[in-house]
């Protein structure tokens, strides 16, 4: 005899699930944005990218349902509105190039109009999620098998450890007016000044150290140049933001155990749920050639992977000539189409955000979002 659970139609189960989810509380838009930045800082996005809140309804705006998609198309927007979304997180920014007008003439302008008319916020993390330790590239690497990974191009810390990008140091001897020097330096905006005793050239002196910006550096040097002794003993150091070991673009993955290219292909197909992918064999390689090191980049990996030493490049798309260049070096190349290397991450993101937001809001995944290219 079948249990009653098996007799409930799927549509009814979905409706019941929707009712349960809809009972959750709301989040204020500003609080949600702050929490999203805590999850993965937008400061890690590439400088050319357009990330963050792209469409904002008039305040106040509260969010009950967050809708996840890889690409915000007109079909996906229809789905988001049908599911009463208040906030769309679109991995790819639907607004990238500047818009000179908002009319019904182009599909992207229509998206903006529909979002505003229906009070739906639109947000894109894009390359910030590529760089994140728990982001898209790290998810893509999970399909390779047990391996150690590191970013191909590590990100730098978002802020300098101290104020300013330059450190300037010099010594003041007893014959010079220390108070005047310190007073003048502290009068320059954007400068952090410290002093400490030091012994230089056999005499007791005061060592002055200050951090400053490029602009204030020129002001400080103009002052010091008035005293030849001070100016000639001045040292300038450039301060760099420290590299972050687990954050950055692309991933270089070293497998614990080498596998044949044929086995690696099947692993990637399984992980991405693809029946086909595109393969360029490296010169002198076969399907039985061993793969130990994989360099990967979700989406378009040509610039990120260029010049990286590996047995295999894995990405969504590369230019014809980049593929030829890699193959000439004996590097195998696997292309899976751009968004096929990204979209699967959203299921994992849905779970992570649920935990991050302590299940305060509904988080749903688009069912209509798909890569525009198909193998026919």
Swiss-Prot record:
Compartment(s) of residence: Cytoplasm; Nucleus
GO MF terms, alphabetically ordered: identical protein binding; RNA polymerase II-specific DNA-binding transcription factor binding
Modification Phosphoserine, positions: 258
Residues covered by region (Mediates interaction with COPS2): 243-376
Family under the similarity heading: Belongs to the GTP cyclohydrolase I type 2/NIF3 family.
Assembly and oligomerization: Homodimer. Interacts with COPS2. Interacts with THOC7.
Name listed for the protein in its UniProt record: NIF3-like protein 1
Taxonomic lineage from the root: Eukaryota, Metazoa, Chordata, Craniata, Vertebrata
